[in-house]
Every structure is written in structure tokens, then in C-alpha cells.
């Protein structure tokens, strides 16, 4: 082992002074050893013997061998600790760490065999922050679902009712045209209408099932507005839309009376001066009517568009009225 401290500088620390006088002091202790000193060792001899027995070629161990190994291990540990403590003082610390021992092994060639046993704790590089990529979804047509149900839990959009698979009919219309659609009795049929700039309005009307539901249809009617959103993964989510008191005044429901039920969509456009509103009347050849049993209603849907084709930011106007006895649908003008 090395007998030189190898430290420069005018002022030396306590660890450096102890290391400089370490080997002269150790050699003096070895010369002064007696037989009594071999009986008591600072390191337990049982561990030394156990380590020596790990070698399969070792058959017998003499009494002096464990004593010599214990003394050599004591000297080795003391010198390595002094060199590691020097690194601790250089870093203005008072606690010996594992990294100090690793630095002492790295600086001195006599400890090279311990490099793989006591690896140096390298500072881990900071993780790179992953760039957050925001994907812009393409402009998709916004769909609105107006659900008119006899009971709150009686109608489900795109579901099943009374063991029957619901069917949907989709009709594309242009501004100025009128579509009249009516589902069959006993089924829930959503009707989707695309108006102008890619906006779609879907109406789901639940027909009464039997006399028991017809009796409760007068007080159990509810309306639910849902917005359909297409996510980045392609999934379709339906989010309920809450209506305030100002928007609820556009939605009026009447008690079911005897007669027929007609769903009539009418589109109006505003004039250039934004004062005169023209109404597209329902043509006789474009109207479709279906006759049903008693206890049904008349609904009319209106949507106002600007001359440039932009829709106004107002909810749909749905009005329920009784149909005259002559079987003709009344005309409702825009406000």
C-alpha cells in the first residue's frame, strides 16, 4: 500500500495529517505486537474463517492465517476511510457518504479492484419534458338532439324500446325547404335534419305504449337537449345542454288532445335591412301527413338564418298547438 499522502498546499486538514502519519504509526504497532495481541482482534475471526472457507481448494486453515487477515483488513479499512474523509471535508460536509468512498477509490490506483464493487453514483440527467402536441380537431357538424318523451326514462336515443330496435331517418335539406317527418306508432324514431352550414337537428318523439301511458302523457312530458361531440379518438359523446329561463320561453308544450300529430319544419330568412322577415310557406306538394290515434300533438320547428347563410345564436322554437277539426295544419309566422 502507498506510504505517501500525496496532498499539496500549505494548510492541511486533520484527515490529511492523519493520513500522512498513518503508515509510520501502523508499522510501529506491527513491530510491537505480542502473543497476547493475537488473542483479541477488532474484527471477529469467525467471519474471516467463513470467508476463507468459501474457497473449495482450502482444506485446512492455520491458526495464524485468520489473525493476519483480520489485521490486514483493519489496516485497509482505516486507510480507505481516511482518504474518503478528505473528500468529505473538501465538500464542506461532516457526514461520510458512499460517494466519498467511491471518489477515494477512483483517485488512487491501489483501489482499482474496488471500482466495480463500489460504483460511483452519477447524477441522473434531468428528464426531457415531452413536447405537448395539441391536435386540432377538424370542424365537424354540430348535432342537437331534441327528445320529447312521455316519461323521463322512457326514451333513449339510439337505443331499444319495448324489445324493438329503433330506426333513424336522416334527411338533408337546404335553406328555404321544408321537411315533414312522422314516426310510426309504437316506436321511437329519431329524425335528423341538416340545415345550412352543416348543422343537424335531431328530433326524437316517443309514442305512447298502450292506454296506461296515454293516461299519463298529459303530465309526464319532458324535453331534453343534448349536444353530440366527436372526440380525437373518433368516439361520439353526448353532453346534455342546460336551458335557462330565457331559452325555455321558446319551448311550449300543450296537453295532448284528440286529433292528429304533425312535425313540421320551417326555415325563415332575414331580409337585407334586418327589419323585414319573409316566411317560406308550406307548399301543398311538400307536406306529408300521417294519421294516428287520439292523444297526440302538433309541433312546429323554426330556425332563422341570416342572408349570408349564418345562423342566429338563438335556440329552436318549438310550439305545440291543436290541429283544427278540418285536418289542416295551422300556419305559424315568425316573430
Curated annotation (Swiss-Prot):
User: What domain of life does the native source organism fall in?
Assistant: Eukaryota
Coiled-coil region = none
Q: Which CDD domains match?
A: HFD_NFYC-like
Q: Read off the Gene3D superfamilies from this record.
A: Histone, subunit A
One Pfam family name from the record? Histone
Listed GO cellular component terms?
A: CCAAT-binding factor complex
Span of the signal peptide: none
Molecular-function GO term, any one: protein heterodimerization activity
Give UniProt keywords alphabetically: Activator, DNA-binding, Nucleus, Transcription, Transcription regulation
Subcellular compartments: Nucleus
> Assembly and partners?
Heterotrimeric transcription factor composed of three components, NF-YA, NF-YB and NF-YC. NF-YB and NF-YC must interact and dimerize for NF-YA association and DNA binding.
In the record, the note on similarity to other proteins reads: Belongs to the NFYC/HAP5 subunit family.
What functional role does this protein have?
Component of the sequence-specific heterotrimeric transcription factor (NF-Y) which specifically recognizes a 5'-CCAAT-3' box motif found in the promoters of its target genes. NF-Y can function as both an activator and a repressor, depending on its interacting cofactors.
PANTHER family recorded: HISTONE-LIKE TRANSCRIPTION FACTOR CCAAT-RELATED (PTHR10252), NUCLEAR TRANSCRIPTION FACTOR Y SUBUNIT GAMMA (PTHR10252:SF8)
- Identification of the protein by name: Nuclear transcription factor Y subunit gamma
Amino acid at each position: 500500500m502507498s506510504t505517501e499522502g500525496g496532498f499539496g498546499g500549505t494548510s492541511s486538514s486533520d484527515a490529511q495529517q492523519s493520513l500522512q502519519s498513518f503508515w509510520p504509526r501502523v508499522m510501529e504497532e506491527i513491530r510491537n505486537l505480542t502473543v497476547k495481541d493475537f488473542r483479541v482482534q477488532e474484527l471477529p475471526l469467525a467471519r474471516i474463517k467463513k470467508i476463507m472457507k468459501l474457497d473449495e481448494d482450502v482444506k485446512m486453515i492455520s491458526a495464524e492465517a485468520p489473525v493476519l487477515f483480520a489485521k490486514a483488513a483493519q489496516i485497509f479499512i482505516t486507510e480507505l476511510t481516511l482518504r474518503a474523509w478528505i473528500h468529505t471535508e473538501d465538500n464542506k460536509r461532516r457526514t461520510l457518504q458512499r460517494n466519498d468512498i467511491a471518489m477515494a477509490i477512483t483517485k488512487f490506483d491501489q483501489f482499482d479492484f474496488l471500482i466495480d464493487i463500489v460504483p460511483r453514483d452519477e447524477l441522473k440527467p434531468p428528464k426531457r419534458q415531452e413536447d405537448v402536441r395539441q391536435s386540432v380537431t377538424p370542424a365537424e357538424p354540430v348535432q342537437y338532439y331534441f327528445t320529447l318523451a312521455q316519461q323521463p326514462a322512457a326514451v333513449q336515443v339510439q337505443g331499444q324500446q319495448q324489445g324493438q330496435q329503433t330506426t333513424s331517418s336522416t334527411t338533408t335539406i337546404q335553406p328555404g325547404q321544408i321537411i315533414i317527418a312522422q314516426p310510426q306508432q309504437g316506436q321511437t324514431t329519431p329524425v335528423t335534419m341538416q340545415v345550412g352550414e352543416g348543422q343537424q337537428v335531431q328530433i326524437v318523439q316517443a309514442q305512447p305504449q298502450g292506454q296506461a301511458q296515454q293516461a299519463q302523457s298529459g303530465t309526464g312530458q319532458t324535453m331534453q337537449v343534448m349536444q353530440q361531440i366527436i372526440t380525437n379518438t373518433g368516439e361520439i359523446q353526448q353532453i346534455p345542454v342546460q336551458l335557462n329561463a330565457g331559452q325555455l320561453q321558446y319551448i311550449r308544450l300543450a296537453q295532448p288532445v284528440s286529433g292528429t300529430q304533425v312535425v313540421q319544419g320551417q326555415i325563415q330568412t332575414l331580409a337585407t335591412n334586418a327589419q323585414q322577415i319573409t316566411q317560406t310557406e308550406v307548399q301543398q306538394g311538400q307536406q306529408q301527413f300521417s294519421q294516428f290515434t287520439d292523444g297526440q300533438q302538433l309541433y312546429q320547428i323554426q330556425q332563422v338564418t341570416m342572408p349570408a347563410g349564418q345562423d342566429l345564436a338563438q335556440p329552436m322554437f318549438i310550439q305545440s298547438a291543436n290541429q283544427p277539426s278540418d285536418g289542416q295544419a295551422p300556419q305559424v309566422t315568425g316573430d
